[in-house]
Regions:
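A short glycine-leucine-enriched loop at secondary-structure breakpoints
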Residues: 118-121, 174-175, 180, 247, ...
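Active-site region of chymotrypsin-like
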Residues: 106-114, 139-201, 230-232, 238, ...
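Conserved active-site neighborhood of the chymotrypsin/trypsin-like protease fold
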Residues: 7-11, 39-41, 51-53, 58-139, ...
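Conserved PDZ fold ligand-binding element
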Residues: 60-65, 180, 184, 254-277
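Flexible, gly/ser-rich surface segments that form the specificity/activation loops bordering the active-site cleft
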Residues: 49, 70, 112-159, 192-199, ...
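C-terminal cap/linker of serine protease catalytic domains
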Residues: 1-24, 111, 137, 183-239, ...
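PDZ domains, with a preference for the canonical peptide-binding region formed by the helix
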Residues: 70-72, 267-296
Length: 323
């Protein structure tokens, strides 16, 4: 959902100033709209599109924290402020492990940074606000519904993600604000869960504590200054204790090895795999990007061994250009 279109969160889900121990309007003013343009030939264009929109949160003078998929390979970024101004930005950095992205404003924002809180001390049941650009009418009064491991199908794993309910309809890059007015996470996804026999939406939020060890690297180098994890370029799902390939990324090692959707990953380097989290942890334990990854695969009645030469996924990305 674009941050620039006219819409409002249902009134019943909007935060009310008297319910929080901080200046709600002042903090929410530092959540900005974000709009990016990505080249048609970018690696991420097929999956994420060439025009992306969401939110970002001012965390330092001219520095905006967002979710990385909004700015990956962006050639142009604009920041939409609450007073109607539009300021150009520069995609400064992206951390593929956490999913965080940083944008540097190329003009004055005149907005106070939102202080960083602690996601570790946040507890299930805590009252929070998932803040979107546009103030209270585009923000959601939520609570922390769960803190638990999250495995994404795209070779992504969080040890302890935050899940909030009710869900924000424009969750990408939204700021999770604690009852102290501090930033404790950034919105990433909307998921469905079953509760009391009914299906309901929740947001998955990347916890802010994952930013603190990598923030300076992202500011200085645009990425975390350590060897990248090995990447195979396969999308998988955990189905009945089996890891099933549901898609293959073009140009990735899995594509070159001619793995197909429907294949089942039985083992990594001889270790039987029964969960997505186990699969990722075993894969990443083999070494940095470039390491050979021996897999045992089941394909249409045949079991075979294959070795994939892993790569650094970010090497496929177009680098940002400073205008």
């Amino acid at each position: 959902m674009s941050s620039t279109t006219e819409w409002k969160v249902p009134a019943a889900n909007q935060p009310r100033t008297g319910d929080y121990a901080f200046d709600l309007d002042h903090v929410l003013a530092s959540v900005v709209g974000l709009h990016s343009i990505v080249p048609n030939d970018a690696f991420s264009a097929d999956n994420l599109g060439t025009e992306r929109a969401g939110n970002g949160v001012v965390i330092d003078d001219g520095l905006i924290l967002t979710i990385g998929y909004l700015i990956t390979e962006a050639e142009a970024v604009w920041l939409h402020l609450g007073d109607g101004r539009v300021v150009q930005g520069h995609a400064l950095g992206f951390d593929s492990e956490s999913g965080f992205g940083l944008v540097q404003a190329l003009g004055r924002l005149d907005l106070d940074p939102v202080p960083l809180g602690s996601s570790a001390t946040a507890e299930v049941g805590d009252r929070v606000v998932l803040g979107g650009a546009g103030g209270r009418t585009r923000s959601v009064a939520s609570h922390i519904a769960a803190k638990q491991e999250f495995a994404g199908y795209w070779e992504y794993l969080l040890k302890e993600a935050l899940f909030t309910y009710p869900a924000h309809p424009n969750w990408g890059g939204a700021g999770l604000i604690s009852n102290r007015g501090e930033l404790i996470g950034i919105g990433s996804l909307q998921l469905e869960r079953e509760r009391e026999g009914k299906s309901e939406h929740v947001n998955m939020v990347v916890p802010i504590d994952l930013l603190k060890p990598v923030l300076e690297d992202l500011r200085n180098f645009g990425r975390v200054n350590k060897p990248a994890r090995p990447w195979l370029g396969m999308y998988t799902a955990e189905i009945e204790n089996k890891i099933v390939v549901v898609g293959i990324s073009a140009k990735g090692p899995a594509s070159r090895a001619e793995l197909k959707a429907g294949d089942v990953i039985l083992a990594v380097k001889g270790e039987k795999i029964i969960s997505q989290t186990q699969f990722y942890r075993k894969l990443w334990s083999l070494g940095p990007a470039g390491v050979d990854v021996p897999l045992t695969v089941y394909h249409e009645g045949v079991t075979f061994d294959v070795v994939l030469a892993s790569i650094d996924r970010t090497k496929l990305f177009k680098g940002p250009r400073l205008h």
